[in-house]
């Protein structure tokens, strides 16, 4: 994973990372400086992906930091072009690029209309997610999801301060709500182990010894 934290310092990144974990994955990379779209960003990302071929996700935080403006007087065309450049790069290298972007301060009946900029941004992406807090600092929010290959969903979330994660507060409509008890036991067991190396048979034996 490559995370472009373009609004943070390395000290702030380190502080936040230590709040989440004491053992960050070796495959997690950070950068605080990047060129703009059409001004070297594509080459920088391509070089990184060549050096780290196992990369599957690039996070750009925020989108505005890599935009360079245009002489064109068509904002929609500018927005669509910028996103299309990044999408082409993602498709070429078979990775996902997650763009963090600001919302308008004005509410809208359609959450997707709250994405700052024109509809050229949401129109060029594969998927769009809008996280809208019930009120600032409440820790309660709804994640609105839409995309070309996913159904529209509204997911109620609550922020878990102990793990610095957003958690789903109720089952997603239409999904299976009953979970195999053995799957629950296995999940809890693996969380307790932290990590495991071995065969499926060895894992099964450990689980049986633990649960009886």
Report residues per predicted region:
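DNA transaction DNA-binding modules
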Residues: 157-212
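Hydrophobic beta-strand residues in large extracellular and virion-surface proteins
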Residues: 28-30, 45, 143, 157, ...
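Conserved inter-motif catalytic segment of the P-loop NTP-binding fold
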Residues: 1-88, 148, 161-164, 169, ...
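Conserved, well-folded catalytic cores of nucleic-acid-processing
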Residues: 16, 20-23, 66-69, 89, ...
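Phosphate-binding/switch region of NTP-binding enzymes
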Residues: 4, 57, 77-165
């Amino acid at each position: 994973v490559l995370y472009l934290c373009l609004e943070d310092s390395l000290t702030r990144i380190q502080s936040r990372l230590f709040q989440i974990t004491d053992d960050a994955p070796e495959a997690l990379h950070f950068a605080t400086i990047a060129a703009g779209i059409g001004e070297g960003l594509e080459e920088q990302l391509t070089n990184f992906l060549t050096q780290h071929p196992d990369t599957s996700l690039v996070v750009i935080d925020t989108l505005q930091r890599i935009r360079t403006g245009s002489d064109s007087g068509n904002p929609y065309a500018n927005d669509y072009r910028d996103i299309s450049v990044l999408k082409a790069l993602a498709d070429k290298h078979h990775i996902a690029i997650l763009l963090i972007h600001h919302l308008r301060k004005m509410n809208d009946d359609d959450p997707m209309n709250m994405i700052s900029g024109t509809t050229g941004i949401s129109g060029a992406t594969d998927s769009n997610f809008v996280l809208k807090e019930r009120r600032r600092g409440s820790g309660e929010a709804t994640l609105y999801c839409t995309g070309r290959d996913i159904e529209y969903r509204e997911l109620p979330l609550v922020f878990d301060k102990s793990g610095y994660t957003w958690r789903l507060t109720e089952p997603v409509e239409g999904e299976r709500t009953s979970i195999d008890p053995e799957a629950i036991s296995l999940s809890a067991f693996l969380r307790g182990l932290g990590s495991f190396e071995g065969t499926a048979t060895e894992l099964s034996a450990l689980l049986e010894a633990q649960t009886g």
